[in-house]
Amino acid sequence: MNKITEDLQNEVQWELENNILPFWMNRMIDNEYGGFHGQITGNGQRVVHAPKGAILNARILWTFSAAYRLLRKPEYLETATRAKRYLIDKFYDQEFEGIYWELDYTGQPVQTKKQIYALGFAIYGLSEYNRATGDKEALDYAIRLFKAIEQYSFDPEKNGYMAVSYTHLRAHETLRHL
């Protein structure tokens, strides 16, 4: 590795460990209702009663899982585990499979349609958590979500995937194909 590449790598890692990850750990964890706050204002104020989105939670899960896998810091594992638990316990629809698009600030489903986009991000997060920890539960849920995408989004006639949403095991085609 040449000096410029090494310096850039060190600078990026410093920024990640001293600014980016601490921001999420110190400002966005919701200790009252679980998971993570769903919104922060431009001047850094948490919006305590903002809804919580599946994409944000899944991205936090992936980010802290990958950070733990690479850097092995226990606080990253703790944050990743918090995100995994919240995703499975609150966002996952145990009855009809899939990930709710949005919860209210207390963790109750608000938008119960399952967007394939959210399922994809949940798979990324859960599979990275499994990769970092070997956690079988995360892998099992990632596989379940993959099967839901195959069941509700694959279009064998066009041999591709539709951007669909479903609520109760009924797929509804949206305006575009992936």
What are these regions (language model features)?
Residues W14, P51-A54, P74-T81, K113-G120, ...:
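Non-membrane alpha-helical structural segments and their capping/turn regions in soluble enzymes
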Residues M1-G53, P74-R82, Y86, K90-I99:
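Low-complexity, Ser/Thr/Pro/Gly-enriched N-terminal "stalk/linker" regions
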Residues Q39, G98-K113, G160-L169:
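Aspartate-rich (DDxxD/NDxxD/DxxxD) Mg2+/diphosphate-binding motifs
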Residues Y117-F154, K158-M162:
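Internal, well-ordered domain-core segments that constitute the primary functional module
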Residues M1-N10, R59-P74, F121-D135:
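Well-ordered alpha-helical scaffold segments within catalytic/enzyme domains
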Residues T167-H177:
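Conserved small/polar residues in nucleotide/adenosyl-binding loops
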Residues T5, Q9, Q13, N43-R59, ...:
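Solvent-exposed loop and edge beta-strand segments that line ligand/cofactor-binding
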Residues K90-E102, Y117, D155-Y161:
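Short, flexible active-site-proximal loops enriched in glycine and acidic residues
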